[in-house]
Amino acid sequence: MDKIEEKPKLAFVGNSHIAFWALNIYFPQWECLNYGVPGEGLAYVEAFDVDTSDCRVVIQFGSNDIYQLNDENVDGYVERYVKAVLAVPSRQTYLFCIFPRNDYDDYSTSVNKFICMLNQKIHRKLEGKDIIYLDVFDRLLQDGRLNPELTIDDLHLNGKGYSILSEALRRTLEQPLKQAPDL
């Protein structure tokens, strides 16, 4: 009797960037489970209790937490962030950086400078851990802001934005486990 080959199983965990990702369109070759919830952040990932141990897990969150952070509490946030990511059970975990956003009409880049610093701290804290970090931050930027050609509302991505994420993830999944390609 022929063995039926199962589709690779991926669980996606995070905020609206995950929730709104048309996974079945971008990844029809995979069984994709979407645990994205709009408006959520660190507390959601810390409380995440779905058994995803038989999946490769893709995580992205943080943009909803930005305005609760400052120079005094950012290091504690990074500690909690990394601990939460490491606690999600998986065959392998792929963590996307926190994405840039455009919050001000005056074309300020300050929020994205802060997000860039936060991403660097998270990435450093993950060194030596069994997490593949997908840094697409610069690919989403134009002149220090989220590229307007990649967003529907200065925060959420459009099809072009999701194509960048999908390409980065697809290329990474084509590599042997625990090895991320240059994005």
Segments the model singles out, each with a brief description of its role:
Residues 1-56:
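Serine-esterase "nucleophile elbow" of acetyl-processing enzymes
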Residues 27, 46-183:
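Alpha-helical cap/lid subdomain in secreted, periplasmic
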